[in-house]
Amino acid sequence: MTEANRILLGVNVDHVATLRQARGTRYPDPVKAALDAEEAGADGITVHLREDRRHIQERDVLMMKDALQTRMNFEMGVTEAMLAFAEQLRPEHVCLVPETRQELTTEGGLDVAGQEARIREAVERLRGCGAEVSLFIDADPRQIEAAARVGAPAIELHTGRYADAHSVAERACELARIRDGVEVGLSHGLIVNAGHGLHYHNAEAIAAIRGVNELNIGHAIVAHALFVGFKQAVKEMKHLILSAAARG
C-alpha cells in the first residue's frame, strides 16, 4: 500500500512481445523492455501469459522472474494449467483476469460473484505459494464485495469503459463509478489498483483518486516509446501520474 498522495506505476510489456510475435523474431525483447522500465522508474512489471500465447511466452516470464529488480505482476486466467504454472513460478504478485481467445484484449472484469467457489480455491492456492493475489474486476460493488469474500487482498478496477467513453458526460459517469468503486474497496480493507486503456491523456483523473495504489499501463507506453524511446515514455507516465496523485 502506498502512502497518501503517492501512486505506483506498473508497466505492462505485453505489447513489446506482440511486436516480436508479429514476425516470429527474437526481437524486440520484452525482458530488456522490462529492465529499461525499471531503470526509468517503474515500480513493477506486468505480464499476461495468455492461453493462446499470442504475445508473452513462458520463457519471457521465467527470465523476468530471475532478472527483475522490482516485482512481477503475473496476470493469468483461472485455469488449472495456469494455476500449476504459477505454483512453480511463485511470483510475488498474481492478478486473475478473465480470458477468451477471440478478444483483442481483456474486455471486461472477472465475474467473481458468479463463481465464488472457483475463485476462492484459486486465491487460496496462489496465496499458499506466497503470492499476493489481486482480481481484475469492474467497479461494481457486487464484484468488489465478492472479491473481499474470497480472500483476495487486492483488486484492480477495470478502467476500460472510462477509457473508451465517447462523450464528456459518459466519461464523467464512468469516472464517478470508478471513484465509488475505490471507496467500496477501501471500506472492505482491499488494496485498490486500476488499469486498462489508460494513456497520457486520461490517466491523470484516475491517478488523482485518493486511495488508488497503483496504475498498470502498457499499450500507451509502448506506443509512445516509438517516438521518444522506452525509458523516456516510462519517465513521462511516471511523472504524469505522480503529479496527478499529488494534486488529488
From Swiss-Prot:
Keyword entries, A-Z: Cytoplasm, Pyridoxine biosynthesis, Transferase
Pfam families per the UniProt record, alphabetical: PdxJ
Cell location: Cytoplasm
Site (Transition state stabilizer): residue numbering on this chain: E156
Catalytic reaction(s) noted: 3-amino-2-oxopropyl phosphate + 1-deoxy-D-xylulose 5-phosphate = pyridoxine 5'-phosphate + phosphate + 2 H2O + H(+)
BP terms from Gene Ontology: pyridoxine biosynthetic process
Binding annotation for 3-amino-2-oxopropyl phosphate: N12, R23, G197, G218, H219
Pathway field: Cofactor biosynthesis; pyridoxine 5'-phosphate biosynthesis; pyridoxine 5'-phosphate from D-erythrose 4-phosphate: step 5/5
InterPro entries: Aldolase_TIM (IPR013785), PyrdxlP_synth_PdxJ (IPR004569), Pyridoxine-5'_phos_synth (IPR036130)
A molecular function (GO) term: pyridoxine 5'-phosphate synthase activity
Primary residence: cytoplasm
Any one Gene Ontology cellular component term annotated for this protein: cytosol
UniProt-annotated binding residues for 1-deoxy-D-xylulose 5-phosphate: D14, H15, R50, H55, T105
Active site: H48 (proton acceptor), E75 (proton acceptor), H196 (proton donor)
EC number annotated for this UniProt entry: 2.6.99.2
SUPFAM superfamilies referenced in this protein's UniProt entry, alphabetically: Pyridoxine 5'-phosphate synthase (SSF63892)
Catalytic EC class: transferase
HAMAP family associated with the record: PdxJ
Family: Belongs to the PNP synthase family.
Function, in words: Catalyzes the complicated ring closure reaction between the two acyclic compounds 1-deoxy-D-xylulose-5-phosphate (DXP) and 3-amino-2-oxopropyl phosphate (1-amino-acetone-3-phosphate or AAP) to form pyridoxine 5'-phosphate (PNP) and inorganic phosphate.
Quaternary data: Homooctamer; tetramer of dimers.
Protein's name according to its UniProt entry: Pyridoxine 5'-phosphate synthase
The species this protein was found in: Stutzerimonas stutzeri (strain A1501)
Gene designation: pdxJ
